Amino acid sequence: YQICKAFRDDPVTSLHNPEFTIVEWYRPSFSMENLMNEVEEYVQTVVSCGKILRYSYQEVFEEKIGLNPHECSLDEIQKAAYTHLDIGSKDLRFTEYLDLVMSEVVEPNLPEFCFLYDYPECQAAMATIEIDDHGNQIAKRFELYCKGKEIANGYFELTDPIEQLRRLTSDNIERSKKGLPEIPIDERFFAALSAGIPKGSGVALGLDRLLMVMGDFEEIDSVLSFSIKRV
């Protein structure tokens, strides 16, 4: 595990500062569900929230949007975005429409404290993909939301070096299309995967955002010693 600074060059908002603090840990032989239990116990030690509710990504998406995110087409998710949001005529990929609808329509209506789990395959990132009881390919990934804030992001980790390389290559192709620099291959990471590492789960939790929840703050600036606004 480690507690460290992380950096992400996204727009500055009430929830995001380019430099922020995370606690990240990995559990060999832990399932995704095991790690969700541990994250819940961790949060309950500092926040009075009771039992944290759990919903599949499909469950909340179907309830609010009326579409199965694992089966709907690009046209269907595009239509849903245009129906619920004033976004003009954007030409986005399927996963980008999913992100947009989830963040702008679904997330604001989530309970105060809840987990979302089993994400669409296209949003697997570095999570393992499995087949659910309905034959859908789902990413074994979860996120924790507290009072409207995404607090944690966890995976049942992908340990297959061939699949990891395929995903990185695919991501770099998309980055090149957008004029973004490619992400270099981490040779030591792939060497470790090739040597064989145990299956398990890992999570990154935003400590600044957790402090916001603990203190009922609306601005991340309120819990930082030196935010980008005051540099």
Where do the model's predicted regions map?
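Short, conserved secondary-structure transition motifs
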Residues: 51-70
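A translation/RNA-centric and nucleic-acid-associated enzymatic feature enriched
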Residues: 1-37, 41, 68-231
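Acidic, low-complexity central loop/insert segments
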Residues: 32-57
